[in-house]
């Protein structure tokens, strides 16, 4: 698998298998497979460093919206060791309640840094 293919795989699987996963053991296994040990995840709510912090954050986030699903909006894009994907989250078969953009940097085939941008909600 090329570096570009691995980055596309990470973009495709991260939302579902980390942030969309309700089972703690499966989520933790995905984190260990997808993220470097010293990973940094930067969100509007804070910065999380390492597998434990990411697992706790993703689990807490999932608990607030257990019935929401993540869907990709458009095609992921990759340039060298970086990738982006736009996404939405909400109830299945309904318009997303919120949307965002993930930007990730890959090192040695794993996500080293993830930046999560949330779009302003319209009301």
Model-predicted regions and their roles:
Residues 2-34:
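Short acidic-aromatic low-complexity motifs
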Residues 16, 39-40, 119:
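A broad detector of the eukaryotic-type serine/threonine protein kinase catalytic domain
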Residues 3, 56, 61-123:
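A beta-strand edge to alpha-helix "cap/lid" segment located at domain peripheries
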Residues 18, 41-44, 91:
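A general structural-boundary detector
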Residues 8, 27-81:
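A solvent-exposed, acidic/Ser-Thr-rich amphipathic alpha-helical stretch
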């Amino acid at each position: 698998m090329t570096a570009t293919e691995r980055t596309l795989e990470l973009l495709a699987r991260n939302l579902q298998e980390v942030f969309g996963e309700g089972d703690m053991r499966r989520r933790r296994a995905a984190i260990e497979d997808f993220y470097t040990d010293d990973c940094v995840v930067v969100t509007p709510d804070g910065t999380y460093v390492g597998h434990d912090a990411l697992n706790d954050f993703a689990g807490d986030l999932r608990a607030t919206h257990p019935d929401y699903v993540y869907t990709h909006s458009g095609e992921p894009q990759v340039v060298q060791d970086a990738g982006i994907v736009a996404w939405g989250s909400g109830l299945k078969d309904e318009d997303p309640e919120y949307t965002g953009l993930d930007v990730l940097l890959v090192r040695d085939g794993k996500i080293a840094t993830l930046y999560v941008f949330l779009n302003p909600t319209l009301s």
